[in-house]
Each structure stands twice: as structure tokens, then as C-alpha cells.
Amino acid sequence: MLIWLVELADHFQFFNLFRYITFRTGAALFTSALIVFLFGPAIISSLRIRQGKGQPIRADGPQTHFKKAGTPTMGGLMILAGIVGSALLWADLSSIYVVSTLLVTLGFGAIGFYDDYLKVTKQSDKGFSGKARLGIEFVIAAIAVFFMMQAAQSAGSAGSTFGSSVTFPFFKDLMLNLGYFFVLFGGFVIVGAGNAVNLTDGLDGLAIVPVMIASAAFGLIAYLAGNAVFANYLQIHFVPGTGELAVILGAVIGAGLGFLWFNAPPAAIFMGDTGSLALGGLIGTVAVATKHEIVMVIIGGLFVIETLSVIIQVFWFKRTGRRVFLMAPIHHHFEKKGWTESQVVIRFWIIAVILAMVGLSTLKLR
């Protein structure tokens, strides 16, 4: 919204700053962090009163988790307030990429909120029907992908199929045109990302820091892919308008820092599905917009590992009646092996940093 102040730059040189994505990204980070810091205590207090017993703890989980009973959930509301409030101030709301990303973020956040609500009111770890939840998520994601695909298509040359194509790291000219099936592919990527972060969110601070790391990596990718000069230099695909997504990702980092202040062990609040689904969906949407869906598998590799551990566990148990891991997702497996919660969290953070660096290295390896 404040980008409109650029029109005053002819009269006041200061307002020229609002033209620069880098300035607005930094401002968005600061603003979202401030929003969470200021309103976080009141939100936590309100949720604690309204929820009573707080988030239910899995009966088959590690014994150390039972001391967390009574901790309120739905902390994603704080994160969403920071992201959306900051985005409304600093992002270009005329950008279809910004609007699509906010649509997915708020849509997935609403689904997560309802899921959290059911879990708290029923005092059960069984919330929203899995199939219904995935179906609604996919519809929201598909709508966003369709509009982003059309935007990328119209920005290309006449007859271009770029908007509906999947690109590959290491190979600049290799593209696979999926046509309208790209909507299905992009929807799968976004829904997968949302639920992968959701599965990772099982320990204090475990999900939010890798989310911030992935956001920083994709903020850089969005800025570079949206800049013709940098995109040409790095030989990555130029996607006009996606640079604006760096502002949104700056807001994610700021909101994440604010949330981590309250989520640091012992957590005063949990993110809940409200936050994890929204944040994962946001990252997935940016990956689709910037044409870096495959690179997201590397940058968000920690989330992929967590998801695969659940898939393997369920598949193998149904097939043989035995478990591959002591408990899934895999972070609980290591807790059962004797790792302390802080050991699991910090070591997984390290893995997230390494994977983000590997993912970013693909930008130059062509």
C-alpha cells in the first residue's frame, strides 16, 4: 500500500525509497516482527483463557511432552497477523503473485484454524477429516496457480508456454510444458508444502526456524528471478513481477522471529495447524511462482524428510505390521532414541541451513 507514495518522489526525494524492493523487504521484516511482539502477549493470554486445557498431547508420544499439557495452540494467528499486516503496508497489492500468495496463506490458515479448533474442543489429536481438508486445500491452491500461470503466460512472448511449464535446476533451456495440467502440478506442490511443514511442527521451535531459513532462500530467489539483469547473469528464468514476493517473505521472517520469542522452550504457545499449514502453503506458492518447484525439494529438504518418514512408516506398517521408525514423524524417532528435544531441534536447524545453501548453489550451476 505504501508503495503508492512513490508518486510523491518528484516532490520529496525520500519517498523514492519505496520504489526499492530491498527497502520494502527490510521494512516488512521489521513491521511484522513488531506486530507480533506488540500483540503476542495479549493473543497468548486470550487463547490460554479460551482454550483451557490447550493443545492435546499424543498419548503415544515421548514422555517429556506431557509436561507441555495446557499450552495454548493457534499461535499461527500471531504469525498471520504479522505477515498480512506487514504485506498490506509494504507489498504491491496490484501484483497477482502477491494476491495469490496471500490467498493461499489465509486460506490454508483458515483450514488450520478450524482443525485446531476441533482438536481443542474435542481434546483429541484427530481434527478435520483428512480427505476433506486436502480437497479444500487443493481447490485454493489450484485457483492461485491458475492465476499465476496466466500472469506468467501473458508476460512471455506470443504463444509462450512458459507459464504452464516446469523448469529444472542445472539446465536453463530444459522445460516441460504441462499445459493446464500445470494447475494440478502446482496445486500438488503447494498442498504438499503446506502439509510437510505441518508434519514438521512437533517440537518447540522445530518448524519456525527452518521456515525462516527457507523464506530467506526463496526471498533471494524471488528477487533474482524478478530482476531481468540478475536472472540473465545467473541464467535462471526471468519471471516478471515475482521480485515483489521478497517483501512477503521478509514479512514471514519478521513474524517468525517474533513468534520464536514466545515459542522458545518452554513454549508459551504452539503454532498449531493455523500457522504450519499457512506457512508451508506460502513457501510452496512462492516456489511455483518463481518456477523453482524442484529446487524447493532441496531447500525444504527437512520438510520432505519428515513427510517421507510418515509415508514410509504408514506404508510399511500396513504391509507388514511392523514399524521402520520408533515413531513418526522422524523427529519423534530421535527423541525415542534418547536425543533431548534441544538436540533434535538444533541439529535439524543445522540440516535446514545446509540444504538451503545447497539449494541456492543450483542458481549458479548451469
Curated annotation (Swiss-Prot):
GO biological process terms held by the UniProt record: cell division; cell wall organization; peptidoglycan biosynthetic process; regulation of cell shape
PROSITE patterns assigned to the protein according to its UniProt record, in alphabetical order: MRAY_1 (PS01347), MRAY_2 (PS01348)
Membrane-protein topology: Multi-pass membrane protein
Pathway membership: Cell wall biogenesis; peptidoglycan biosynthesis
Keyword Cell cycle among record annotations: yes
Gene Ontology CC: one annotated term: plasma membrane
TM helices/strands, residue ranges: 27-47, 71-91, 93-113, 134-154, 174-194, 205-225, 245-265, 268-288, 297-317, 343-363
Record-linked InterPro entries: Glycosyl_transferase_4, PNAcMuramoyl-5peptid_Trfase, PNAcMuramoyl-5peptid_Trfase_CS
Major localization listed first in the record, in broad terms: membrane
Cofactor(s), by name: Mg(2+)
Location relative to the cell: Cell inner membrane
GO molecular function list: metal ion binding; phospho-N-acetylmuramoyl-pentapeptide-transferase activity; UDP-N-acetylmuramoyl-L-alanyl-D-glutamyl-meso-2,6-diaminopimelyl-D-alanyl-D-alanine:undecaprenyl-phosphate transferase activity
Keywords for the protein's UniProt record, in alphabetical order: Cell cycle, Cell division, Cell inner membrane, Cell membrane, Cell shape, Cell wall biogenesis/degradation, Magnesium, Membrane, Metal-binding, Peptidoglycan synthesis, Transferase, Transmembrane, Transmembrane helix
EC number from the UniProt entry: 2.7.8.13
Catalyzed reactions: UDP-N-acetyl-alpha-D-muramoyl-L-alanyl-gamma-D-glutamyl-meso-2,6-diaminopimeloyl-D-alanyl-D-alanine + di-trans,octa-cis-undecaprenyl phosphate = di-trans,octa-cis-undecaprenyl diphospho-N-acetyl-alpha-D-muramoyl-L-alanyl-D-glutamyl-meso-2,6-diaminopimeloyl-D-alanyl-D-alanine + UMP
Superkingdom assignment: Bacteria
Tagged with keyword Amino-acid biosynthesis: no
Function: Catalyzes the initial step of the lipid cycle reactions in the biosynthesis of the cell wall peptidoglycan: transfers peptidoglycan precursor phospho-MurNAc-pentapeptide from UDP-MurNAc-pentapeptide onto the lipid carrier undecaprenyl phosphate, yielding undecaprenyl-pyrophosphoryl-MurNAc-pentapeptide, known as lipid I.
PANTHER family assigned to the protein according to its UniProt record, in alphabetical order: PHOSPHO-N-ACETYLMURAMOYL-PENTAPEPTIDE-TRANSFERASE (PTHR22926), PHOSPHO-N-ACETYLMURAMOYL-PENTAPEPTIDE-TRANSFERASE HOMOLOG (PTHR22926:SF5)
Family in the record: Belongs to the glycosyltransferase 4 family. MraY subfamily.
Protein name: Phospho-N-acetylmuramoyl-pentapeptide-transferase
Organism: Sinorhizobium fredii (strain NBRC 101917 / NGR234)
Name of encoding gene: mraY
